[in-house]
Each structure stands twice: as structure tokens, then as C-alpha cells.
Swiss-Prot record:
Subcellular localization: Nucleus
Record keyword DNA-binding present: no
Alphabetical UniProt keywords: Coiled coil, mRNA processing, mRNA splicing, Nucleus, Phosphoprotein, Spliceosome
Compositional bias of kind Polar residues: 140-149
Molecular function as annotated in GO: nucleic acid binding
Annotated organism of origin: Drosophila melanogaster
Protein name in UniProt: Septin-interacting protein 1
Family, as annotated: Belongs to the TFP11/STIP family.
Entry superkingdom: Eukaryota
List of residues that carry Phosphoserine: 43, 47
Residues covered by region (Disordered): 22-164
Phosphothreonine, modified sites: 53
The keyword Nucleus belongs to this UniProt entry's keyword annotation: yes
Residue stretches in coiled coil: 363-411
Encoding gene per record: sip1
Length: 839
């Protein structure tokens, strides 16, 4: 195969149109190619006479000229389905094409004549090989009618049913007869469509999206009829224009474009401005000046373009005026040959047009900027006028408020009601200036002297509530507003300064004449003024006016000769002064009370009455230390004088000691009883048990002493231990009487021994005490069973007949059904009372 003759493998529109056409024309193989197949030689030297006829036709084609410039070929898939029109060509190209066509025609006719078979798809007007319906008459005139024409049976099927487009169906008529209403849907719920779905024919057989965005299917009858009417009008107008311009041509029946009338297209200023507003059309003015002298070569199009600068990149390629708006020439991708072409003149004209457009766009931009700047300046001017007017109003307001302030300051005969009226005008009518300039601070320098002069005749201790309405009125004026506005500007806020400079002088004069022992007047004064006084002012009154007077009164107080109790005029200040009294007053009181208690005796009950009010005032440690130092030694001596006699007990001394248990801590009271009471009490109990007494009487004596002790004291370990030992001694003493009933032979009599508590301890019995009680109950037929879930002091409770008891070591604690009152009893007494249920 020669260099100029090669086979292309790209897919063209012809391949897509004849993809499924079995009668498409194909190249005929020579005899040599049929024999040797792929091993056949296609070179011109070795080709025989069989293939010479075709090669002669191919050799007659015009060879390619490689000296000509490179022409770019448009890539992609060509738009198929459109009718192609003949383009105007030069005379030499017509001659060469005519010669090539005659050679090809002669070759095909020879092959057809040699084969003796009809040639399919050559001159058949219904064959798919023909390009369009308009070209068929021309081709038929050029080709001779010597060859046999064979029509394909497939081509005849194209016009089957074409007559239906001239008829009218009766489907709509039948629907109207069945009750169909035009414009509504079909079916019971009118959900069906009455028009078929309109399908849009694609331009070719390429892939989806190859011809632009796909058109969605629509329902017939719902399209906008006005659009179709406009299209029909436009097509009719175009057809009329073409008909008027039609003139019979020499070759194809159409007049060349050069002979037709020229059309001129004008751009308005609005179009140029709108084009300039599009992004990327023109570069900015600064960038255009910088890049204006740069030579740019554009090779992105079919041919090379030399541009004067980067600003020309966004402009379209220069096209002749004749084909500027020719849609058909644009679709073909080629323009008619230019007879008169002057690139330099065209470039200069285009440059002038571009410069003119740029000037128009620049003027428009400048006009827009000036308009925006003018609007901004007008807006700023209006704002400045408003600011000037506001400042004038502000100055006038300041002058008016200044005039009232000068009347407050410069008037020596100003009274408090007049000052109040001016002050209220400033607060109400000039509130912004009042808060901005802190006019409330005038209260300390202007209002306070007037208030002090107003309160000269006021007696605070006699009439504490007289000036309260006036002070409440000034507090409302000086403390109104938000919390942020009430923050003090100086050391004191305005209201505190007014109270300190106007009211405190009257408080100081009244406190100097106040007697501390007469506390109600001062207490009433502070109770009435406490809600109105600032916290720091109230603290100052208590610390600087009240506390010094209390300290002076305590120094003058004598507990032995003074008839007024000190707690009546000192303790009322405890809730207010608190720690201040503990530091300055209470130590002096304790010191004087201790001196007075040196000669005190417990039979004098006034000491306890004098100390009881101070129990909650003094700290707990200080109070207990004071009692241990001055009271407990006196109580120890009294307990030493107490005589414990079970037969005739005198409890006077015991009451003198026991009445202090509310003041003395239980721990210290337990230590006092452990050292000075319980040893002698245990000794008396042991002596009494050695004299064969009545154990019921001993039990009552034990219960009586225990009931006199308080619950906190009974929980002390030392007291509990003494009571436990007493119970154990009582139980062991009762066991000596029950010993003969347990064993058949009584033990030998014990010789008398000195009364010593250790001698009363017997060796342990062979049985446990619980087993002994159970055995005795079984012998007498008495029920002895534990109660599930019942415990007292951690001990199991048992049912013994009609009574309930629990065993604490070797002592029986008995109670009735209340389970509240428990008392110790002997085993014999338990067995006797268990049958009757009476303790």
C-alpha cells in the first residue's frame, strides 16, 4: 500500500448510520486477493491485471501537497441526521473532482460489467449509501444507466404506513362519547394521561450526551403552544427571506454569497456594556496596560493567530462579515473562500473596535464608580448633618442641665425641698447627662449639708423613725438604675456619702449620751435604720459607737453589788457584734465572774442562774474550762459530804451537784461521779447484800439511782462499767440462795469473812446461766423460748411464761409486753412472776 493511500480506522457518521445496514457498499476484492487472502501483495509492482483497474482509479486522485500549511481537522463525533448542502468550490477543485468521479465511475462500471451481477447500493435512491434525498437527481443525471439497478426490499419498507399522517383517528371522539372531559385525566380518579408520551428523536447514533444535554420525555398536549406558534412564524419568515433572495445559479441553482446583498450588524452601547460585564471578556485596565505590548501567538484554533496582547485572548476569531451570522457555514466548520483578504487591515480594524469597546466599558465603569461615590458622599453628608443636629441638641441640653446645677451650688439660701425639686428635675428630664457626668455625686457636697442642718433638732434615741421617709426618698433617687450604674465612682457611692455626712453626726451625738445598761433605745434605733444604712456604715456604727460603750459598761460592772444582770444588756448584742464581743467584752466578764465565785458555795443556787445564759454565748471550750476551774472543785467537796444510806437517803447534797449537769459536759460529770460517788456507792451495795436483804428492795434502790442519771451520762463508759459491776454483784448474791435447789446436797456453810468485794466472787458453776434458767423453767412447766428477730442491747430476748427477758451476763433483765422498761430481777422472782405476768 502506498504512502498516500492508507486506511483510516476512526468511526465516522457513515459508520454509525450504516451500522445495521446489510446492503451497505463495500470494496470489491480482486481475484488475486480472493485467492491469497491476507497474504496477497498490494504493491503496484506485483499487482496483476485483476486489480489494476481500481488502482488506476486511485492513482488518478490528486496527491497531497505537503508544502501547504497544516489544517486542523475537527475531532469528536460529527453531528449526524442533518441534511448536507453543497458548498461553493473553486473551478479547479470542480474539475479535479469531476475527473476523479469519472474515473471511479468507469472503474465501477467495468467491475459491474465484468462480474455480470447487479451492483447493490450504487444508484439506488432508496439505499442508505446515498447522502440525502436532494442529491439523488443530480447523481442519477451524472451516472449512465447502463448498469443494472436493483432495489433492496428493505428500502421499500421505509414508506410503509406513511399514508396515516394524512388521516385523522377517531380515538378522541370515542373518549368524548364515553364521558371524557378535555383537559382532565383518564380513569376513575383521573390519574391517567390522555395524550401519549412524546419521545424526542436524537440527532444520531452516538453515545448518550454526545450531542449535548438529553431532552426529557414529555406528555403530549401539555406543551406551550405559544412557543410552537412562535417557531412556525419564525420559520415562515426565514423561508420567505430565502425565497426572495433565491436566484438561479449556474451550477447548483443557488447564487454565491458574494453576489447576495450584504448584511450589516450593529452593536448598541448596552450590548457592549453587557459584554464587558461578562467574566473573562476583558482584563482590568492596569493589567491591560502592563500586558498591552506583549506579542501573543494563539495556536489553540485551526490556524495560528498572532495577537497584539493578552487582552485579545478573550475575543473571538475574526470572521468575514458574510459568514458572521451564517449558521449553516458555522455548522459545517468551514467558511467560503475569501476573495479579498487583508489581515493587517482586518487586525487594525478589529483593534480599533476593541479599543472603542474598552473605552465604552471604561466610561461605563467610571460612571458607575462616580455614581456610587456620589451616593456614598450624599449618605455621609446626611449622617454628618444628623450628627451636627444631635450635637446641637446635646449642647442645648448640657446648657440647661448646667444652669440647674449652678442653681444648686451657687444659691446660699437654698432649702432642702428646693434642692430636692432641682435634683429630681435633673434626674428625670436630663437622665442621660445625670448618669454620664455623675451628677449624683453632688449629694455629698450639696445635699448632705442641707440634710445635716435639717436633722439638728432630731433626737434619735427618743424618736428613731422621724426622718425615715425623707431618707427613703433620697435613696430612691440616688440608687435607681442598673447595678452597673450604681458602682461607686469615688471612695463612697452617692447614697453612702449622703448618709455618712448628713445622718452620722446625729448618731454620734446620741451614742455619746447612751447608757449601755439601757439597751432598748439603741436597739430600736438600729432596727429601724438597718434596712436604710449601707452595710459598711452599719458596721461602723456598731464597732465605733456601740462596742466602745459596751466595753466601758462592763468595766464599771460589779457582779456582787450590781442589781441589773449583765446578760440582760450584753447578750442582746451577741447576734450583731459576735466576734467583736468575744475579743473585747467576754474575757472581762469571765474574769469578774471567776473572782466572784471564789467565795461561792454550791448551796447558793444564784451562781447557776447567773452562768446559764452564757452557755451559748461563750465558746464551748472556754465555758468548760471556766466550770472546771471555778465550779467543779466546789462540787467535789459537796459529793464528799454526801451520805449514802439505803434506809434513809437524803438527796439535798446530790441535787446541789446534779443540777450542774446541764452546764457541765457529760464526760467531765462522769469523771466527777467516778472519782467521788461510785466507789462509796458500790461499797454500800456490797455491805447491804452481805446482810441477807430483800433483793426486790435492792433492785428498786438500784433502779432509782439509775433513773436519776441522764441518758448522755449513762452512755459514758465509766458509768456503764460501774452499773454493770453492781448488777453482777447482785446476781452472784442471788445465786447463793438458789444453790441448794440446784444440787441435792447443800454446800457446807461459809465462815464469816470481812466485807471485801473480791471475796464475793464465786467459782463458775458447771452450767451456764441460760441453761440454768431453761432447766428451772422446764422443771416448773414454764415456757422458755427465744423470740425471732427480737434483741435488746444486742442480746436475744426470751419468752418466759407471760414475761419477756434477756440475759446480760448473769443478770435477768425483765419487761412486760411494751419492751421499753427493763429492770433486773433475781431468778426466783422471775420464776414467780412469769406465771402471773405481774412485775
Amino acid at each position: 500500500m502506498s504512502d498516500n493511500d492508507y486506511e483510516r480506522f476512526e468511526i465516522t457518521d457513515y459508520d454509525l448510520d450504516n451500522e445495521f445496514n446489510i446492503n451497505r457498499p463495500r470494496g470489491r476484492q480482486s481475484r488475486h486477493q480472493q485467492i491469497y487472502g491476507i497474504w496477497a501483495d498490494d504493491s503496484e509492482e506485483e499487482s496483476g491485471g485483476e486489480g489494476g483497474t481500481k488502482r488506476r482509479g486511485r492513482a488518478a486522485r490528486k496527491p497531497k501537497d505537503y508544502t501547504m500549511p497544516v489544517n486542523f481537522v475537527a475531532g469528536g463525533i460529527q453531528q449526524a441526521g442533518k441534511k448536507k448542502k453543497k458548498a461553493l468550490q473553486a473551478d479547479d477543485e470542480k474539475g479535479s473532482q469531476k475527473e476523479g468521479a469519472e474515473a471511479d465511475q468507469g472503474e465501477e462500471s467495468d467491475d459491474s460489467a465484468a462480474s455480470g451481477r447487479p451492483a447493490f447500493g450504487q444508484n439506488d435512491p432508496g439505499s442508505s449509501n446515498s447522502s440525502s434525498e436532494e442529491e439523488r437527481p443530480t447523481l442519477s443525471r451524472k451516472q449512465p444507466s447502463t448498469t443494472f439497478q436493483h432495489r433492496s426490499h428493505i428500502a421499500s419498507e421505509r414508506n410503509v404506513g406513511a399514508w396515516e399522517q394524512h388521516t385523522r383517528g377517531i380515538g378522541a371522539k370515542l373518549l368524548l362519547q364515553m364521558g371524557y372531559e378535555p383537559g382532565k385525566g383518564l380513569g376513575k380518579d383521573l390519574q391517567g394521561i390522555s395524550h401519549p408520551v412524546q419521545a424526542h428523536v436524537r440527532k444520531g447514533r452516538g453515545a448518550i450526551g454526545a450531542y449535548g444535554p438529553e431532552t426529557a420525555a414529555s406528555i403530549g398536549g401539555k406543551t406551550n403552544k405559544s412557543i410552537k406558534v412562535d417557531e412556525d412564524v419564525r420559520e415562515a419568515k426565514e423561508f420567505k427571506d430565502q425565497l426572495n433572495k433565491w436566484r438561479k445559479g449556474s451550477a447548483g441553482g443557488a447564487e454565491p454569497m458574494e453576489r447576495q446583498g450584504k448584511r450589516y450588524y450593529y452593536k448598541s452601547v448596552e450590548e457592549v456594556i453587557a459584554k464587558g460585564h461578562t467574566s473573562g471578556h476583558l482584563l482590568s485596565e492596569k493589567l491591560s496596560k502592563k500586558l498591552g505590548n506583549v506579542r501573543v501567538i494563539d495556536m489553540t484554533g485551526p490556524e495560528k493567530r498572532v495577537l497584539s496582547g493578552y487582552h485579545a485572548l478573550g475575543q473571538a476569531k475574526i470572521t468575514p462579515e458574510e459568514t458572521l451570522y451564517d449558521t449553516e457555514a458555522t455548522e459545517k466548520g468551514s467558511a467560503p473562500a475569501c476573495v479579498f483578504a487583508m489581515p493587517e487591515l482586518t487586525h487594525n480594524l478589529q483593534l480599533l473596535v476593541s479599543q472603542c469597546e474598552q473605552q465604552i466599558i471604561a466610561i461605563d465603569n467610571q460612571e458607575r464608580e462616580c455614581s456610587s461615590q456620589q451616593a456614598a458622599l450624599e449618605s455621609e453628608h446626611r449622617k454628618l448633618e444628623e450628627i451636627v443636629q444631635l450635637e446641637r441638641n446635646h449642647i442645648r441640653t448640657l446648657e440647661e442641665s448646667l444652669e440647674r446645677v449652678e442653681r444648686l451650688i451657687d444659691n446660699p439660701d437654698l432649702s432642702l425641698p428646693q434642692a430636692e425639686r432641682l435634683f429630681r428635675e435633673l434626674l428625670v428630664d436630663y437622665a442621660a447627662e445625670f448618669h454620664e457626668f455623675g451628677l449624683a455625686d453632688l449629694a455629698a457636697g450639696v445635699i448632705a449639708p442641707l440634710l445635716k442642718r435639717e436633722l439638728v433638732q432630731w433626737q434619735p434615741l427618743e424618736n428613731p423613725t422621724e426622718p425615715l421617709p425623707l431618707i427613703k426618698k433620697w435613696r430612691g433617687m440616688l440608687q435607681q438604675g442598673d447595678a452597673a450604674e450604681q458602682q461607686p465612682r469615688n471612695v463612697f457611692d452617692p447614697y453612702s456619702s449622703l448618709i455618712w455626712a448628713g445622718v452620722m453626726p446625729s448618731f454620734r451625738s446620741s451614742a455619746a449620751a447612751w447608757q449601755p445598761k439601757e439597751h432598748p433605745p439603741m436597739a430600736s434605733l438600729l432596727d429601724a435604720w438597718a434596712p436604710l444604712l449601707p452595710s459598711w456604715v452599719l458596721d461602723s456604727v456598731l464597732e465605733q459607737l456601740v462596742l466602745p460603750r459596751l466595753v466601758a459598761g462592763v468595766q464599771e460592772w460589779d457582779p456582787l453589788t450590781d442589781t441589773v444582770p449583765i446578760d440582760s444588756w450584753v447578750l442582746p448584742w451577741h447576734a450583731i457584734l459576735g466576734s467583736k464581743l468575744e475579743e473585747a467584752v467576754y474575757p472581762q466578764i469571765r474574769s469578774k465572774l471567776g473572782i466572784a465565785l471564789r467565795a461561792w458555795s454550791p448551796h447558793d443556787r444564784s451562781a447557776r442562774a447567773m452562768l446559764t445564759p452564757w452557755q451559748k454565748a461563750f465558746p464551748e471550750e472556754e465555758m468548760q474550762e471556766f466550770l472546771q476551774r471555778y465550779i467543779v472543785p466546789k462540787l467535789q467537796a459537796t459529793l464528799g459530804e454526801l451520805i449514802i444510806n439505803p434506809m434513809h437517803q437524803d438527796l439535798e447534797l446530790w441535787q446541789q451537784v446534779w443540777e450542774w449537769h446541764e452546764l457541765i459536759d457529760p464526760m467531765y460529770m462522769a469523771q466527777l461521779l467516778d472519782r467521788h460517788f461510785f466507789p462509796r456507792w458500790m461499797q454500800v451495795l456490797v455491805v447491804w447484800l452481805n446482810q441477807s436483804p430483800d433483793y426486790a428492795e435492792i433492785s428498786r434502790w438500784y433502779t432509782g439511782w439509775k433513773s436519776m442519771l441522764s441518758e448522755p451520762l449513762l452512755r459514758e463508759p465509766s458509768v456503764k462499767e460501774h452499773l454493770r459491776r453492781a448488777l453482777e454483784i447482785m446476781h452472784r448474791a442471788s445465786d447463793t440462795l438458789l444453790q441448794p435447789t440446784v444440787t441435792p446436797t447443800p454446800p457446807p456453810p461459809v465462815p464469816p469473812a470481812p466485807v471485801i468485794m473480791m471475796d464475793l466472787i464465786h467459782p463458775p458453776a458447771q452450767l451456764e446461766f441460760k441453761e440454768l434458767v431453761s432447766q428451772q423453767c422446764a422443771d416448773l412447766g414454764i415456757i422458755f423460748a427465744p423470740l425471732p428477730g427480737r434483741r435488746e442491747m444486742g442480746k436475744q430476748i426470751y419468752r418466759v411464761g407471760k414475761l419477756f427477758c434477756y440475759i446480760d451476763r448473769h443478770v435477768c433483765m425483765v419487761s412486760d409486753g411494751s419492751f421499753s422498761n427493763w429492770k433486773p430481777v433475781s431468778l426466783n422472782h422471775l420464776l414467780e412472776r412469769s406465771q402471773t405476768g405481774i412485775l
